[in-house]
A protein has these predicted regions:
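Membrane-embedded alpha-helical segments of integral membrane proteins
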Residues: 108-150
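Helix-start (N-cap) detector for alpha-helical repeat units in TPR-like alpha-solenoids
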Residues: 22-23, 39, 55-57, 90
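Internal/C-terminal transmembrane anchor helices
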Residues: 158-181
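Beta-loop motif signature
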Residues: 34, 187, 194-223, 228
Length: 251
């Protein structure tokens, strides 16, 4: 019994000694990737994710590894996860579009209201953190302008300072809204990617439901409802149906 306990603690201590920190795993994974050892690099990146870390760079590199290994569904999944953290990254968007070119389903999106599209384009032109910095800058400018309004040497200067302070307030609130909206979007689990080579979308949440259409690996969808192991989905072109949870992975 004592020998068994000793062996247990010996193995436990040995595992702690051999355990790599996330920083060491990151460096090792990057080195492996640069040597085109994509499968080994992938395992190191996954260990970092399993330890609880999440970042745009980590998801981006995971997407790259899966793409190099020709796992298109997983590649798109991780590019989409990275995109939720930084919607303005051009390299990320280019890689995502490249991966989508390898997906069999070519779905035409239903165009949104032009004003909504315009606002979203502005919102996603910067990351959530960048919008937070902008908000702080605008609020700081507002505070300085209000001081100038209070202690300005002339009525004209005070009037200009007041209007500029109000403009800074509005811009600060807008930047704060964009930052919070992106954070809220990241917290949502309402989109998913098909992981199976072929998946059937049915008219009802069971295998006996009528087959409506077929989806292939890498296709993105919005999740509307869940019943048991089935999820009601909507595609970018407006088509809806039920798909088994086993065939998809939430972004």
């Amino acid at each position: 019994m004592k020998r068994a306990i000793f062996l247990f603690y010996f193995c436990f201590v040995l595992s702690l000694v051999n355990a790599q920190t996330p920083k060491e795993l990151w460096t090792n994974a990057n080195n492996l990737y640069s040597k085109a050892q994509y499968a080994d690099a992938l395992q190191s990146y996954l260990k970092i994710e399993e330890s609880g870390y999440a970042s745009e760079s980590l998801f981006y590199n995971l997407g790259n590894c899966y793409f190099k290994l020709n796992e298109i569904g997983k590649s798109i999944l991780y590019y989409e996860r990275a995109l939720k953290l930084n919607p303005s990254d051009e390299d990320l968007l280019n890689n995502l579009n490249l991966a989508k070119d390898f997906s069999l389903d070519k779905i035409e999106e239903v165009p949104d209201f032009i004003l909504k599209t315009w606002i979203e384009d502005i919102n996603y032109s910067f990351s959530s953190d960048t919008w937070s910095y902008f908000a702080l800058i605008f609020f700081a400018a507002m505070a300085l302008l209000l001081l100038n309004f209070r202690f300005g040497s002339s009525s004209r200067l005070r009037k200009i300072s007041f209007f500029l302070a109000m403009a800074s307030l509005l811009l600060g609130l807008l930047a704060g809204y964009f930052s919070l909206s992106q954070r809220y979007r990241y917290s949502l689990k309402n989109t998913a990617i098909v992981m199976k080579p072929v998946s059937t979308v049915r008219s009802s949440p069971d295998d006996s439901g009528k087959s409506l259409f077929i989806l292939h690996e890498g296709t993105k969808m919005e999740l509307l409802e869940e019943i048991g192991d089935w999820k009601r989905i909507e595609l970018a072109d407006g088509r809806q149906g039920w798909i088994t949870s086993l065939d998809i992975e939430v972004i």
